């Protein structure tokens, strides 16, 4: 019997495809273009950094890629779903299925314990089961090194510990993409480095795509890809790291 060998390689999945994205805002006297005709493709499992000067529009771009906001023009596909013509309710369903968020300000509910904060995204799912959600949340807290702080509220946690809770919360619904907007901006330098390494470690372990918006070029250069938003254009820097 003759064996037939396929020469077709398994190509990495394009998880985000943006074509000619444009964002404009209307001011009282004029229309301001934040950026125009931006295109990029991001593969599943990649670590991607977006940098830029303050006011360059990098957080605006993240909001569009993460389906939080709608672009003025262009085409966006996230996890195989065309976003550009969806309304807010439909975009929210895309986020619920595919996306987790880590913010600079942690955004934990102060009256809930760490484990309760981590469980929050699962409460939005129709199949929510408390016991299963709690077990998954406890497992994630262990993964981020906070199993002993599970029953503590945010006010007794350090900034780094609160961000670890936020990272666990971002992962609880098993998203395909994590968007992190200045995730270490409120932390001291040592804690910031620890959180950065945790994000990279979880990216490698779980295969989740990581998209960072940061002003820190040292952090950006640790990512597999580094884009800079400059004068309304997106420039990809050649990778220099290992």
Feature-to-residue mapping (PLM):
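ABC-family P-loop ATPase nucleotide-binding domain
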Residues: 1-24, 236-242
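H-loop (His-switch) and adjacent beta-strand-loop-beta switch element
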Residues: 226-238
């Amino acid at each position: 019997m003759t064996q037939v060998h396929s020469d077709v390689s398994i190509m990495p999945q394009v998880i985000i495809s943006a074509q000619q994205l444009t964002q404009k805002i209307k001011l009282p006297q004029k229309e301001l273009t934040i950026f125009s005709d931006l295109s990029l493709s991001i593969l599943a499992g990649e670590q991607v950094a977006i940098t830029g000067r303050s006011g360059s529009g990098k957080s605006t771009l993240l909001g569009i890629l993460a389906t939080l906001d709608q672009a003025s023009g262009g085409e966006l596909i996230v996890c195989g779903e065309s976003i550009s013509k969806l309304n807010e309710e439909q975009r929210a369903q895309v986020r619920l299925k595919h996306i987790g968020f880590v913010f600079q300000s942690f955004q934990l509910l102060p009256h809930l314990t760490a484990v309760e904060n981590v469980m929050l995204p699962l409460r939005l799912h129709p199949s929510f089961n408390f016991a299963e959600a709690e077990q998954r949340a406890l497992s994630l807290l262990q993964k981020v090194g906070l199993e002993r702080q599970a029953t503590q509220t945010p006010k007794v946690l350090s900034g780094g510990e609160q961000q670890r809770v936020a990272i666990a919360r971002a992962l609880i619904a098993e998203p395909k993409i994590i968007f992190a907007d200045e995730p270490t901006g409120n932390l001291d330098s040592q804690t910031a480095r620890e959180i950065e390494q945790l994000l990279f470690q979880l990216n490698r372990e779980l295969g989740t795509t990581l998209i960072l918006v940061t002003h820190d070029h040292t952090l950006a250069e640790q990512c597999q890809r580094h884009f800079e938003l400059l004068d309304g254009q997106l420039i990809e820097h050649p990778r220099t790291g290992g």
